[in-house]
């Protein structure tokens, strides 16, 4: 794959992480397409050895942590700014670490990209959470940059210890 393209995609992801960590969520929304799908399936531990990682994940319609489109993402973002949003008062402090960025397919208009993440969140005095996993994205070229058209977030954890999932990945 083209190293310049990979570098541009890395810069896009680093900008996204910066916006999320600085709580610039409205600006983050501008990085998404109007028809975005942003979802996190539930991971389970099958009794038999799975043939593929997808065998460990819920399928669409079977349950999920969230399955958002632009409308629901806007609602989630605006809720974080509300004074009565108990899940984010006081706001979370996050650090998004994005690694192992791999271009899987480039059809000229859309690019399939996989990346690994570690999202560290702290709240209050002692609340700490770590979310670790992989993201399967579809980026769409837009005005010399990219927009996120689809993101599947796959957590390594089958059981979440976090009190909520109010952060974005």
What spans do the regions from the language model cover?
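A contiguous catalytic/ligand-binding core that recognizes phosphate-bearing ligands
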Residues: 94-97, 104-107, 120, 130-131, ...
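Beta-strand elements of well-folded, non-transmembrane domains
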Residues: 117-123, 141
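Short, low-complexity N-terminal intrinsically disordered segments enriched in polar/charged residues
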Residues: 1-34, 46
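Short beta-strand segments enriched in hydrophobic/aromatic residues
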Residues: 32, 117-119, 152
